[in-house]
């Protein structure tokens, strides 16, 4: 099985969050979960699947945080989907300065990860409001992240934001 590709309908998921955020329901009925279906009513969703022990996840998350600061909460909800427990995920978010919401994919079955056909992390998917995957990427691929930056800029009708800075160790690719 391989990760879902562009043009595929994104499987729905509702996952608990590490902490409350505007993108996460505080409803008692759903247990305070983030619902992909509900989020898509407000805009696109960038779902980034990760493990805290993954060196490529550690490398890439500061760049995803830059995307969040540039475009998040406008017409795109950016969420991490952790394959770890709440305590370790919270420590990861703090260590890497991540401010976007992180969700927990139950390690007992990894239902969301399996639905998306994950073979490696990080794997990420930009999901359009129509529920279709617009971009998917496995590992770190600089060209994919640059394409994502352009798409988010276009979707938000804003100038393209600088994602990479002088002195950044930006590799063309790193397998997950």
Regions found by a protein language model. Name each.
Residues 13-45:
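A short beta-strand-turn-helix
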Residues 58-96, 109-112:
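Structural microenvironment flanking redox-active thiols in thiol-disulfide oxidoreductases
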Residues 129-176:
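Thiol-/selenol-based redox modules, centered on thioredoxin-like
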């Amino acid at each position: 099985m391989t990760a879902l590709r562009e043009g595929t309908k994104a499987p729905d998921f509702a996952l608990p969050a590490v902490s409350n955020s505007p993108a996460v329901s505080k409803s008692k009925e759903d247990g305070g979960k983030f619902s992909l279906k509900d989020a898509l009513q407000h805009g696109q969703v960038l779902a980034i699947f990760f493990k805290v022990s993954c060196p490529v996840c550690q490398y890439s998350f500061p760049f995803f945080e830059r995307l969040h600061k540039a475009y998040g909460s406008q017409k795109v909800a950016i969420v991490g989907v952790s394959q770890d427990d709440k305590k370790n995920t919270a420590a990861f978010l703090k260590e890497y300065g991540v401010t976007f919401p992180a969700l927990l994919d139950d390690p007992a079955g990894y239902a969301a990860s399996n639905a998306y056909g994950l073979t490696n992390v990080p794997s990420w998917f930009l999901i359009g409001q129509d529920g279709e995957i617009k971009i998917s990427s496995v590992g770190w691929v600089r060209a994919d992240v640059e394409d994502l930056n352009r798409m988010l800029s276009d979707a938000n009708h804003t100038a393209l934001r600088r994602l990479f800075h002088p002195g950044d160790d930006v590799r063309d690719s790193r397998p997950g």
